[in-house]
C-alpha cells in the first residue's frame, strides 16, 4: 500500500545518500609525514568510532603516500590518480572532502603525460626557434629527448563529454584539445629518468612561457576560471588539487567541503644540508623546494607557492602553527609535539561537526535525536591509541 511504498522510497533514498565522510588529505609528502601520521593515528580512529555510533556512518581519510602503484608511476599517471581520488571524495562524502596542509614546499610539477598533437608540435617549433637564437643553450639542446620520449598515438582521443560539467571539473581549456595526442613512454626500464625528466621539464616550461605568454602570466595563474593547458607545465600536483578541491567550489560549498591547515617553520630557509649526511625527515630539501646540484632555493617554485597560499580564503583556515626548525619535525621536542596535538584537535573538532551535520541529512530520525546521540558520544568515547592505524583507499 501507500505506507509500504513510502517506506520503500525512504529506504531507497537512504541507500543512495552518501554515508561516509570521505576526505582527501592534500599536501606535499616529504615535509608533512608527521602531520599525516598523527592525523591517521589519533584523529581517524576517533572519527570512525564517532561516525559509527552516530547511525552506522563511516569516516575515511584517503592517503596517497602509498596509493600510487609502481606501474602507474612508470606510466606517469600520478597526477591523474590523485585527481580521480579527489573527485571521488567530492562526490561520495556527505561533508568535508578536502584538507590542504599548506607548508613551505610547492612540490612535484610533472608535465602532462599526454600532449595534444597541435600543442606538442607548436612547442617543438618554439624550441627549435629558441635553439636557432641561442645555439649554446644546453637546455634547448635537450629538446631531442622530447622527440625520443613522446610518441604520436593516432588512436588516443579523449571521449566526447556525455554529462553536464560538475563544479570541480577541469575546464575544457585546461584539458586542451581532444587529441590525437603525443603520449609519454613508460619509464620502467630507464635508469636515469630523473635527469631526463628534469631536462624535458625545463625545455617544455621555457617553450610554454613563450608560446602562451598571456595564459602563463601571473594574472592568469591567479584566476582559476582562466586555467589553460599551458599551466599544466607550471603547476604542482598539489596546486591542481587545491584548485579543484577548493578554488573551483562556490563560496557556500567551500565552507562545507574544504579546510586548510597552515604551518611555517622558522629557520628553514637558513638551514643547510651540506656537511654530514642527515637522516630521512631531517633534510632541508624535504621541506622546501631546492634546485640544481648546488641545492639552491627554487625561487620560481616558491613564488608559485606564495601565490597559491595567497588565494586561500582565511575563513577556511582551521589552524595555523609556527615552529622552529628541528631539524625537521622532531617528536622529541615538546614544542613540536604540542603543535601536532593542537593541529589535530582543531581539525578533529571541524570534522566531527561535519559528521554531525551529515548524520542529520542521512538520518530518518529528527535532528534532536541525532544531537542527543552526539552529546552522549562526546561523553562516552575515550579511546587510547597505541601505534599507528593507516587507512588507505584506492579508486
Residue ranges and their predicted role:
Residues 1-379:
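Conserved catalytic or regulatory cores that recognize and/or transform ribose-phosphate-containing ligands
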Residues 375-395:
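Walker A/P-loop phosphate-binding element recognition
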